[in-house]
Amino acid sequence: MVMLLPVALRAQGVLIAPHAIIIDHRTRSGSLTLYNPGDEPAEITLSSFFGYPVSDPSGGFELKTVDQPEPDYPSAVKWIEAFPKRMLLGPKQRQTVRLLAKPPANLQDGEYWARLVVNAKGGSVPVEGVADSSGVSVALALEVRTIIPLQYRKGKVATGVRASRLDAAIEHDSLAVRLRLDRTGNAAYLGTLRGALVDSAGKVVATVSSPLAVYYDMEPRLTAPLPAAGLPAGRYRLKVDVASERQDLPPNLVLASPPIRDSLEVRLP
């Protein structure tokens, strides 16, 4: 049984930090800490692949993977190595994994990407509802895979986004917001999108917020709950702000860029 989990969750009892890795060309190294707080050992394997987040046709987020990246892709997969790559992490044991970069000598300035995979095996989940008169219990062995973004920065790096096609609609008891974001510069854009629906008196009646990672372009769709009593008919304005800040990342890891603001009138019949 294989499960894909966010890093904030326990991967088969193994805790992983940090949940995003950025390596500078001057040091060419990074690290990852694994900790097993459980009572059973966990077999850990590390690997990497090239991929980046995109939006699907409905506006949801998904990870696009490229098995054999072409030369024009900024892939760091072939020259980032983890030490050790395999280990048995005992109960209450902590392990530091070193990440070493050996980029080509002619590497151009910019940002290069990889996805680090931490695969943890160990433990089991009992299968309920399986009757056995002999008293034999049934359980599934678990394998949990955690995917962590890795970015390698060399020389002058810059980023930003352009926003377009802002759209909004009231769908049942929610506000649905969608827009297109195109990245500028030579590095992924890490930021936060915030939206606020205000009435004619300037009162905020609904808000939406989401972290962003724009590697090329995307058209995310976000929803926010509306007041339980509903909204009266009339004109409202949606105000959207996209800023290069993230609550889940240290400020020094987020490349600064000018904020983007847009607005749209929303009419309720």
Regions found by a protein language model. Give the residues of each.
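Surface-exposed binding patches on compact interaction domains or structured appendages
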Residues: 12-15, 41-99, 201
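Short, solvent-exposed loop/turn segments enriched in Ser/Thr/Gly
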Residues: 25-31, 95-96, 108-115, 173-177
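Asparagine-centered strand-capping/turn motif at beta-strand->loop junctions
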Residues: 34-40, 101, 181-185
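Terminal connector regions
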Residues: 49-52, 102-151, 230-269
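Short proline/glycine- and polar residue-rich coil/turn motifs
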Residues: 87-94, 211-220
